[in-house]
């Protein structure tokens, strides 16, 4: 049986890379009269199900945009709740290595709490030899921020302006070596890419 109780048919060609903007959790909770935090918990649970299903059907790459650089502007209580949920998730994510899922985090880790950074590193190190799904989790990620990060890295390496190419910038992105997403899905139904 498939993810939604239907028989799986994976004989067709799969895309290589699907990206999901994990949004709409707060609106989902509000519609049900629940606190926003309940929406984030439900979203995290759904994410785990989706990641395992994508691994099962043989998808190569799944990227989830979990927390953008712009999300820091949300109320402190909500951000703290998301960070606590992230801690719990990262402790549980160690199970992914047993499922042959390779976990990688995208984004600027600098403003994150030390314990969260340590858990991220533990997950990456623990799953580095996995050969199944490449699961990219974007935390404190923004598309523009990623470009700035790449350019700063190039400048720090002392590469002259005349040697800077599109490929060089691409090679210095958080997403270096990955194919571009074939699909970007927003569960909220919005038709915008935000800062991803």
PLM region spans:
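Flexible, compositionally biased loop and terminal segments
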Residues: 1-196
